Amino acid sequence: MNLKSDIEIAQNTKELPIKEIAQKIDLRPEEIELYGNDKAKISWKGINCIKKNQKLGKLILVTSISPTPAGEGKSTITIGLGDAIRNQLHKNTLIALREPSMGPVFGLKGGATGGGYAQIIPMEDINLHFTGDMHALTSAIDTLAALVDNYIYQDNSLELDPNRILLKRGIDVNDRTLRKITIGQGSRFNGIEHEASFAITVANELMAILCLATDINDLKKRIGNILVGFSVKDEPVYVKDLGFEGAIAALLSTALKPNLVQTLEHTPAIVHGGPFANIAHGANSVIATNTALHLSDYVLTEAGFGADLGGQKFMDFVSNHLDKRPDAVVVVATVRALKYQAEESTDHLDEENIPALEKGFANLKRHMENMAHYGVPVIVLINKFASDTDQELNKLKELVQDDGFECEIVSYHDEGSKGGIQAAEKVVELTGKASDFKPVYKPEDSVEDKIAKIAHKIYHAKDIEYSDTAKKQLAEIKKMGKDELPVIIAKTQYSFTDKKKILGAPEDFILHVKDLALKNGAGFIVVATGSILDMPGLPKHPAALDIDVDNNGKISGLF
């Protein structure tokens, strides 16, 4: 039985020079910018050259059921499946993934580079500083906030109201103490005193913009369109009104270029951008996915959290910005997560419990049927854990197949690409089937109708209840003429409802809309439901307690 940790496996794997990985996808030396021997950015010369290639590969979206707090191995499946298609089926394959946020690495969830023998490497670099994209974003976020505060202090000819500034500062750390602060305290020499707050870097609008921008000009335009706040005369003020878009774009110009790394089995992987799926759109950058589509025959990408969050947002929003729609959808399921959805105690998830599995199956059933309603072929992959019994695995596969869906059991974590060759064959076969894409809502639908259609069709809510604050914000959005934008619903990842403890597949509940936020630069409206936080906190035993580094700089304890 394998007892090696993820980081031990990664550190004991021989990497290929990143130049050789680039050659696998026909990138010339002048089309990459090296970050040491194992990481690179694809240059603008490379990106512009790739765009001329008319070829478009098959796009495979990997999503999942509602997760347990520890996650269900979606990234592991994405990486392992990509390795299997490339190295076992010998097809030209690329993986496109989000880059991890550093905050959760030291918190509860840990890193986001896969696990076991299905990882992207160098895992410690990717999980920590990588190529500096997150630091560039944090600098851009806080520079913009500082410029706005300085504008109010120095001139403020537009009479921007310091109490109606919508921008948040950013830091890529889980720190609950920064959710609400007061700045400019003391004398006026320290600035204008007003309340402010921090969001984790990946929750900031600039992260969404980085992931949606198609080039530097588009990046600059989107930054200029960010709504800063309102004047004392109730007029909206945008970044372009203050003239800061050029400086902020300059800070992000290098971060906009996608990063190239490899898997343990040397499959090329583009890792770029990382918005959360519960509070943003939850997909890697458009530049990364489009670049991958032009470079390979098969591209695997994932959508954050469950199919009700990242999956829905990918289908209804992200795919509108890509060069093509998904050709197939993979829904990742685990035995333990379905037992959790049956309200089984986390202390007993490793014990065989067929009745709990059957009860929890309702959650998977809804997710896979929701994805099928988009008109794209769907397959379920069961991520096998050591604690799963054969009876549980076979029962789950039977339940899925009885509902009319393809299903395979995979063990990429323990076996690498050999842990799911038949699954890879079936996924490739599915991409060749005809699809008839049907979004949940139409672009011309009103904001209320878009929210209602997602709530009814995806969540199975009975009704929607708007807070007084949300009603006021909706009226402001309509007054500005921005109510034609897509909606991104911010919701707990653990439930179809806005309450994380209501598990399974609930019906006929009320979805509570707490507030709405116009993300004008990104081009969507965030609809906050329940108690959603954009600045996480740390748990009682943070992962940081288990992380260390020796005198040779070798890091241990990352997972």
Swiss-Prot record:
It comes from Lactobacillus gasseri (strain ATCC 33323 / DSM 20243 / BCRC 14619 / CIP 102991 / JCM 1131 / KCTC 3163 / NCIMB 11718 / NCTC 13722 / AM63). It catalyses: (6S)-5,6,7,8-tetrahydrofolate + formate + ATP = (6R)-10-formyltetrahydrofolate + ADP + phosphate. Belongs to the formate--tetrahydrofolate ligase family. ATP binds at residues 68-75. It comes from the Bacteria. Gene3D superfamilies: Domain 2, N(10)-formyltetrahydrofolate synthetase, Formyltetrahydrofolate synthetase, domain 3, P-loop containing nucleotide triphosphate hydrolases. GO terms for biological process: tetrahydrofolate interconversion. Keywords: ATP-binding, Ligase, Nucleotide-binding, One-carbon metabolism. This is Formate--tetrahydrofolate ligase. It holds the Pfam family FTHFS. GO terms for molecular function: ATP binding; formate-tetrahydrofolate ligase activity. InterPro entries: Formate_THF_ligase (IPR000559), Formate_THF_ligase_CS (IPR020628), P-loop_NTPase (IPR027417). Pathway: One-carbon metabolism; tetrahydrofolate interconversion. Its EC number is 6.3.4.3. The keyword Repressor does not apply. The keyword Nucleotide-binding applies.
